[in-house]
Regions:
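Histidine/acidic-residue-rich, glycine-tolerant segments that coordinate divalent metal ions
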Residues: 86-88, 96-107, 113-114, 129-216
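Acidic/His- and Gly-rich active-site-bordering loop/insert found
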Residues: 3-108, 113, 117-120, 124-137
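Metal-dependent amide/peptide-bond hydrolase catalytic core
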Residues: 1, 48, 212, 216
Length: 216
């Protein structure tokens, strides 16, 4: 059995847990920064798999970091799992056409219930593979709020949570199973301060330095 076949078998072995988690998040349908039940469901599922849980990283109430280490000296692999529902995208489950729920404002019509569940499946499968094979590594799964209209990943980046990662994986459901070749725009803000040097414009203009020159 190849490594890929082994990992596929490990994913299939936990498929019922993955589906159950996805359905829970679907039914919770919580908007960005208010995904309390979704975050708890995902962190509880990872805790049951032996992951240590850090709650509220960077002060985000609906975020967590789940970590599992096998051996010593291995790489750090991070999976980003998100679970925010979106406004105007409620949907009756199991229906191929758009059937919004009359009493629901938010929903997972964009498949964000799968974002967290899929990352859960990947993190657990890699953890199980490391345990079975003795592969040294650390697996982390970030429970990340506000995939849209908020940017939970920005807070993780600003807090240094990606600094020790050797690889970071995120995904989004779509019409095909592929690796995206598209680039993504960052939304991290950076503040620069440019300082000049004052001088008399008539007598000693050569002694001055314009901060605008650097800014331009």
């Amino acid at each position: 059995m190849t490594d890929a076949e082994k990992i596929n078998a490990l994913i299939c072995a936990k498929s019922a847990d993955t589906i159950a988690l996805s359905e829970k998040i679907w039914n919770f349908a919580e908007p960005n920064w208010r995904e309390a039940q979704s975050a708890k469901a995902m962190s509880d599922a990872l805790c049951a798999e032996g992951f240590a849980i850090e709650h509220m990283p960077c002060g985000m109430q609906t975020a967590f970091v789940a970590s599992f280490t096998s051996g010593t000296g291995g790489p750090v692999i991070v999976y980003v799992g998100e679970y925010d529902a979106l406004s105007g995208l409620s949907q009756e489950a199991g229906m191929p056409q758009h059937l919004p729920l009359a009493d629901e404002k938010y929903g997972h019509g964009c498949g964000h219930n799968l974002l967290g569940a899929g990352s859960f499946a990947a993190a657990v499968a890699l953890k199980d593979y490391a345990v079975e094979t003795g592969l040294p590594l650390t697996v982390k799964c970030f429970g990340c709020p506000a995939e849209e209209d908020g940017g939970g990943k920005v807070f993780f980046a600003r807090g240094g949570y990606f600094n020790d990662a050797d690889a970071v994986f995120a995904w989004h459901p779509g019409s095909a199973n592929l690796v995206s070749g598209q680039g993504c725009l960052a939304i991290s803000g950076v503040l620069y301060t440019f300082k000049g040097r004052t001088a008399h414009a008539a007598c000693t203009p050569f002694a001055g330095r314009s901060a605008l020159d650097a800014a331009e």
